[in-house]
From Swiss-Prot:
Disulfide bonds: none annotated. GO terms for molecular function: copper ion binding. The gene is cutC. Gene3D superfamilies: Copper homeostasis (CutC) domain. Transmembrane segments: none annotated. Belongs to the CutC family. This is PF03932 family protein CutC.
Amino acid sequence: MTKLEVCCYSVDCAQIAEKAGADRVELCCGQSEGGLTPSVGALMQARETVTIPVHPIVRPRGGDFCYSSNDFTIMKNDIARIRDLGFAGVVVGVLDTDGHIDMPRMREIMSVSGSLAVTFHRAFDMCQNPMIALKQLAELNVARILTSGQQQNAELGLALLKDLVAATKDQGPIIMAGAGVRLTNMQKFIDAGIRELHSSAGRTVPSTMRYRKAGVTMCADSDVDEFSHYCVDGEVVEAMKSLLVMGSPLAKHT
């Protein structure tokens, strides 16, 4: 059956995702940056309170995936911490200046990761040649690739996603579709034979604060509503899981 990974920007969200039936959590912070490395405190709390597999992302900053020496050292230190805390996996990706997989650095990352299941994240979608990148990641023995099919959302990238699935039918990384995967379109990914789906399955919830200071923001973008935040919607996760069960080949023949 197709698995559902839920992208969570807090431990609260991870707990909601687990209760709603998610198969796995990708733990991040920094939603506006597309996901950054969670704090040590968040990692510790997730290990203590979430029982399904949690894969923290290791991404020291927003923007591209070509990192300075300091960035890369920080990434390796973070991966070692995640490994030592006993997480199931880690989500990471590094490119070189020409938009190819940075093989020397990825080999170092694989070595530091030890027994962690490594997901190569959507840095894959920024690669020059996805099929070459796929072969390189297979050589590295990464567990899975999170990808939108090199498009702004995974529905637009279905053609490449199908090619990637076909190329890994017998061996190689699991292809996990992500970016714009929703309850309303997930059947398309199931029908395409994609084994894992990645979704934030979220909604915006209002702040619990009653007093709200006007005219002052903490964000450089003063138009951002800082009295609301994004959170996993447990009902959506439950509905997505139900559809995955009904849409599985086994369910269709019972």
